[in-house]
Amino acid sequence: MILKYSLLGNLLLLWINIVNSVVMVGLYYGFLTTFSIGPSYLLLLRTRVMKEGSEKEVSATTAFIMGQFIVFISTYYPPLHLALSRPHTLTVLVIPYLLSHFWFFWNNKKSLFDYRSTHGNFIPNLSIQYVFLNNLIFQLFNHFVLPSSTLTRLVDISMFRYNNKILFVTSSFFGWLIGHMLLMKCIGLVLSWPWEKMRSNALFRSNKYLMSKWRNSVSQIFSILLFIICICYLGRMPSPIITKKLKESSKREEKKKTEEEGNVEIERVSKTNKIKQEEDGSVEEDLSISLEMEERWNLYKKIYETEEIWLNGKEKDEFDLKEKEKNKLLGIEKSLLSLLFDYQRWNRPLRYIENDRFSNAVRNEMSQSFFYTCASDGKQRISFTYPPSLSTFFEMIKKKMSFRTAEKLPAEDLSNEWVSTTKKQRDNLRNEFINRIEAIDKGSLILNVVEKRARLCNDEEEQECLPKFYDPLLNGPYRGTRKKGYLYSIRNDSTTSTRGSTKTAWINKIHAILFSKDYREFEREFEHEMYKLGVKSSSTGIEDSSVSIGEFTEEAEEAEKSRTRFKQFAFGGEEKVFEKVFDMVRADPNDQKISNLPIEEIKKKVPRWLYKLTSDLDFEEEEEEEEEDDQEESTDDHGIRSRKGKRVVIYTDTNQGTNIINTTNNIIKTHDNIIKTTNDNIIKTTTDNIINTNDNIIKTTDNIINTNDNIIKTTDNIINTNDNIIKTTDSNREKNSDDKVENGDQAEENEMALIRYSQQSDFRRDLIKGSMRAQRRKTVTWEMFQTDAHSPLFFDRIDKTPLFSFDISRMMNLIFRNWMEEKSPKMKTSSYVGEGAKEKEKIEEEHEEEKGEYKRKEDKRQEEERIAIAETWDNIIFAQAIRGSILVTHSILRKYIVLPSLIIVKNIGRMLLFQFPEWYEDFNEWSREMHVKCTYNGVQLSETEFPKDWLTDGIQIKILFPFSLKPWHRSKLRSHHKDLRKKQKNFCFLTIWGMETELPFGSPRKKPFFFEPIHKAFEKKIIKVKKKGFFFLIIIKDNIKGFIKILNEKIRWIIKIVLFIKIKVKEVFFFFVLRRVSDPSQNEEPSKNEKDSKISNRIIHESPIRIVSRDWTNDSLIEIKINDLADKTTKIWDQVEKIRKDKKKKPLTPDIEDIDISTNKGNCSNKRTESRKHIWQISKKRRSARLISKWDSFMKSFIERIYMSILLCITNIYRIYVQFFLDSTKKTLNGYTYNDEIKEKDTNEPNPNIIPFISTVKSLSTYTTNISSDSNSPIYCDLSSLSQAYVFYKLLQTQVSNKYKSESIFHYYRTYPFIKDGIKDYFHDYFHTRGIFDSESKHKKLRNSGMSEWKNWLKSHYQYNLSHDKWSRLAPLKWRKKVNQHRTIQNNDSPKSGSYEEKDQLIHSGKKDYSKLGLLKSPSREMKSPSREKKIKKHYRYDLLSYKYLNYEDVKDSNIYGSPLQVNRHGEISNYNTHKYKSFYAITINDSLEDKYTIDRDQNLDRKYFELRITNFDPRNNIETRTSTDIGTFINKKKKTTKTGTNKKDILSLYIRIHQEIQTKQKEFFFDWMGMNEQMLDRTISNLRPWFLPEFVPLYDRYTTNPWIIPINLILFDFHGNKTSDLYIDPKVESNQKERFHPKPKVESNQKGYLELENRNRDEKERQHQGNLISDIRNKKKDVGANSAGSDIKKRRKKKKFKSKKEAELDLFLKKYFIFQLRWDDPFNKGMNNNIKVYCLLLRLMNPNEIAISSIQSGEMGLDVMLINRGFSLPELIKKGIFLIEPVRLSIKRDGISIMYQTIAISLTHKIQHQTNQGYQLKKYIDKNYFNGSIARHGGVRVNGDNNNYDLLVPEHILSPSHRRELRILSRFNYRNRNLVNKNPVFCNRAKTNAQGFEKFVNRDKHFHTDTNNSLKWKVFLWPTHRLEDLACMNRYWFDTNNGSRFSMSRIHMYQQFGIRGCYSQFPSLSRAWYMRTCK
């Protein structure tokens, strides 16, 4: 047996080795490659189908196999692979070959296809070589048709798995060859069938013409198929010839920009000099400086324009010739390159990202994934987020300076060196850290121990430092962009220069190194240049060369000035290869004289696209702007596709100097006059008419507005359009004024236009023209008018409505309702009359709702039909011209031919009928009819003015006061009887059939019939005739009554006689029947049986069988049978009666005996069985009859019961939810009573009133008790043993639990330590019993856990905890103009969101309160769809498993180091009870977030924004803190009491807090940003999220008390001035500045302060009183806001221009934080749109009174929309709800700047550090990072400032931030021991540490982790590589596939918990830190 098993095992092993061998795998993949069929197979099949001869078949097969062999070889041979794989090279080769191939084929058919067979194999035949070449080349093209190219790529992918690549390629080729032979064999069998059929046909054999024709047709079919396939594939390739030539930004534009910058710079310098003159009085020196600056700028501009470099000893002409030759060569080379392929064009279908602050778009190079090697942990690793520009730079350096590079050391040596270096650094930092702790333990002062950072001090005595923004010794987020300053430099007195000064010469070497072909040649030229300049250069190139220069010649000075903006670079690091590459040359500092020279700004040039693109719709506006700027420029190049839209001119102003505002004012005045003149006729007499007109605006304008364009649809678009119109008219007005001055009375036209968009779906918009459409994101469209694009991957998930769909629930409802309606009339005796009436009313209401719904659907359907018709006309070529011509023709025919002819015919007919003619009335009405020309959307123009380009854009003709022919006219005296409420639409539109329709493209309406009034008149006449004959009819009726009475008596007598005869006949009939029924045997015993018959046959039922009259003498057989049947029937009825009687006495049983079967005989035993059978048949018939009779009532009752049960279920469901909601609300309110006993009871015992939503896990209590019994032992879970496959498997199986206790994990996006102990135990047991965690390895040491302590910190904090100021610094890019929707979580983390009464309650509240608050997250109104909920649950499941997979550690006695399911039973939550002081960044981002979507704070939708300075805001007066606006705690700081209740008046609190003068005794403190210096009390966590209605809880708690805007004078200073001072306008200031006054809104209290704009002069005075804290550099930026971007405003070319930088920065600030808009309801929008249409017509009329009155009467123009009262103040507009002031909700976008800033911590020293204010927090500048609000949200409880040991909360903060980060990083790496846990003894194993001072410091208290003042927090933040990769695999929501092909990382959730410090690290000597820039 053993031998057999061993042999079997060997055979199995041998088989496995054979299968896994290179040869077998190659054969397998090669065989799969056969099924990738390309167009080359068509050529091969053509030779076989056409039977052209064996030579061609052999040549085609040989070429095909050879081409495939070359393709296989190319996978191994790189040069061949590059030649065949590069698309551009292949395209260049393919296009000429295809053209020649098809041209040669079509022109040489006869010579090419020679069907005569050749007898010799070696006779030269061109067709054979041609076939060979075709098959060979087409096989190399390597494009595939079926199924795809994936099977072919498998060979390339699998080849890298094996070392023996040649063997793999060879075997794969043979595998393909085998598959190819089999495939050809099968195809040959199929193709042989048609040839056999043709050979069997005698006609084909005899007729050679048919054979040749068939061959030609087959050849053409193959060629056409091949041509189509090739064209399709060419569309997928970048064509180098047919490309969109984009316009390059010209040098003249750049020159103009530099001139503008220079002019702005000179103006700024002159303004600064004026200020200095006023202060210092140094007039002469400053004037000379300004003149000198202007001269220098002119010289710089001259040098920039010429761009000539000429040195000493060389003439200018020589350099000119050389430069021209170089430019010619470069131009030729560039033209050749761009002719074939422009590498700077948009090849991929990317969106054009445009920034308003710059001219061209920024190239977002970091968004795409890029692979490059970099040093990590001392080893070369592949980084997939490496910057492409940096890799290109290193490649250039390597090529140019390869001789200077150091020798490459082995990887092991590099790793050893890195390990040793990092160990030394770690030890040094550790020793320094321990020494500082020991110094603290010995009693040293904190200031002497804390590591300090140098600051640049402005005043040494007062210790005033420069602002962080300008401090050169600081780096990080406080370092902004500095503008060009002026520094005093050294000048040589002996220099006799006309310009009076010299500059320091900086000669850059790196520029020539990178862009020269030979470095040695550059060295020689450089030395020669230095010699010409008289400079002694250093020979080493490593050290700086600072050599004296005696005197500069004038040529040398010019040469120095000609060098443009060289920058100084320095490469830092351990390798000194590129260190100090630049040799600097300085002037001689012997003779010193002060002069003002500009400092070159060191910038990083942002990579931008070369082209500046414009969209099609922006062309008009930009064209006008360019005409203003430069008449020579023209931007005919539209590089961006925009939505299909047409510009429609609606008004043209030809008058000189008029504008749209004056015109509209005249219209409004005209309307005022109209209203005044028509008050008596309209307002008084037709009040109801006007009210109904206004009420029915929606009905009359629904269909009109739907055909309008998108801009007229929405109010925002209307506002935007109006803004553009005002801009256009303003620009034209300025042009007109200029032309009037210059050219006299030269009139120009001002056009007012709208843009009409197409309703058809267009997914090409915003794409760049010329980009490769095949590589764009794939979309699926299945409808003609589709609103959204869908990916093919998710197409199956879309709910597509089938063709035949039935609403089952609706049908059931109708059926049940019908049953109930049938039943309701029968329930007349019911006592519930009231309920029946209610039910009837309810049914009627439902019926009305259904009718309304049907009407809405019908209107929507008609609207869609109109849109489809309009789009069809718009898309068909020349359709608009044809339609417009037809409409104009019909209009002319109707107006001047048809209607006058009808009038003439009518009046002639009246005269023939002897009626008076109505010529005047008819022609008067005919003259009132107006045919107004309208745009395609219905915007009215005039009768004579046609729309611009109406033949191409379309036209509508609107008929006002349409004429209808009437047989006669009523007199005007009877008009008052007319019902005024019946409004008649006195307008219509003309159709192409000459008919009238109410809406464009609508259905024709019914016209009044001409003879209808005549018909009505005849009916009235008939009625009159009937009335006259009424009396005659009454007389006749009275006379007829007597006759009728006599007739009735006679009829009654006849009826009585007939009845008597009928009775007699019945008696005779019954006598014969009874006699025949009796039995003949009865005659024998008459006495006895007579008695029995009387008893048994009392009731003789009629027989159902018809009895025919019979002959008494002759009895036939049929008559006998009839008699027998009658006898049996009577017997059956007797038996039924007897059974009924017996049943009453006793129940019927199957053993019934002795029943009389016959009426004549008694008990007959021979008939006993028969009697039983008859009895059961009778009973069976009886039951069926009973069922049949009661079936109807049974079904009704059954259906009633079902219907009632359904209703009961529905009501129960509602009751459950309502009860659940009430219980949750009750618990929420009870949560603030601070009763620990109730909380404990609620925690440990389930609530019986709450209905559980999932089944309870079996024996949950036993598991809980078992675990709780062993509560002292820590619980761990090893998640590192999970494999990737197991993770995905569990992702599929993991279901989101709905149990109310576990909802806080899945639905409440919060941290794990707030989960109750019972929940943790439950999940721990649940997951262990389900086998998710490996219980065997839970106590083992974890691999790689030594460097992953940071993960425990991550899981213990909420990941969006960022300050508002922090987020405001991120500044997302301006080009994101769309709403960026993110699912955000309601804020529960604000420092002021909760309070505590006592410190001891902090732990309990943190452990228990969150189980009741926000457990079940109800989706908002935007998220109610099941698919949305499903997606949210999926994301929660991903996040939950991701956290479980990331966060694991084996650390004792620390909740943050424990398992995510571990229960901390002793309440030792060290990381959460530690009080953290609030810093400048402590306000969380979550205060502005909600369960809704956030919008981009940088979007600019052309809305009007609020001015910053009108807000009267002082955050120091924040006395009362409202923690919630609906239900929450109300805190009074004076009394320190907490109230619980509902603050209803806070629900609609103002968005801007008006200053309240409340007299309080507050001590002075520094500037309180957002209320950070306010006193924090012990308060509970205010987490007021109802379970079902979260949208009713506003999340503007902090904003209502402290808005996110502050006065400008408080942003940059610590303000010590008057706290209650308001910002106002001084009436005594200069009046030349523009000021805007805003009236006071009506707010709470009787305040009389107004929201006014502060004056800039007052602002400057207030700043002067505060003290001059900064130098002149600071004074130049007085009014810059806190979020100043620092970018140059003049770069915003063709954009919104500001008068000053202050306005630009203010505009940027307002766009970030505020959005101010007009909110109009939908009916208001429609009414406004209708009014606009009427206004367009009234503008063109000389006397618009009649049209205006008729428009008002018909409801086409509404008075309530006109806002005639133009004196509305701001409070009234706010009160009406028209004007809204709202904060823009901050989005959670991040960019590269934020990632860099989050890695840097700033340490500041300030004198206020030593101050202590009682009752307030201390202001600290040691490190603002750790004073964050993430812990304060759990209860920042410091009230008393006596305790000064807050500096020791984190001992590592003794070090500087840079050393602190370095210490953390170095301590987390396990250099050699990767498999074991080797923790840092200082941090993790305090018992073994050698530092006694640290031991004493840590072990002062047993409850160290729970002590607020002594808590130690270890904060690690490094992302390891493997965890990021796992995260990418597990949660695809965090990643994105960009542009359809590449994989780029986006939306990485940043775990930002401690202020500026985040999850990334910037450490120069380590490259493990990841820098990621989110692309979206």
Swiss-Prot record:
Compartments it resides in: Plastid, Chloroplast inner membrane
Compositional bias segments (type: Acidic residues): 619-635
Composition bias, Basic and acidic residues: 836-861, 1633-1665
Any one GO biological process: protein transport
Keywords: Chloroplast, Membrane, Plastid, Plastid inner membrane, Protein transport, Transmembrane, Transmembrane helix, Transport
Subcellular location, principal: plastid
Transmembrane region(s): 11-31, 64-84, 87-107, 126-146, 173-193, 221-241, 1054-1074, 1202-1222
GO CC terms: chloroplast inner membrane
Membrane topology annotation: Multi-pass membrane protein
Spans annotated as Disordered: 619-642, 830-861, 1633-1669
Annotated Pfam families: Ycf1
InterPro entries for this protein: TIC214
Subunit comment: Part of the Tic complex.
Function description: Involved in protein precursor import into chloroplasts. May be part of an intermediate translocation complex acting as a protein-conducting channel at the inner envelope.
Family: Belongs to the TIC214 family.
PANTHER family: PROTEIN TIC 214, PROTEIN TIC 214-RELATED
Protein name: Protein TIC 214
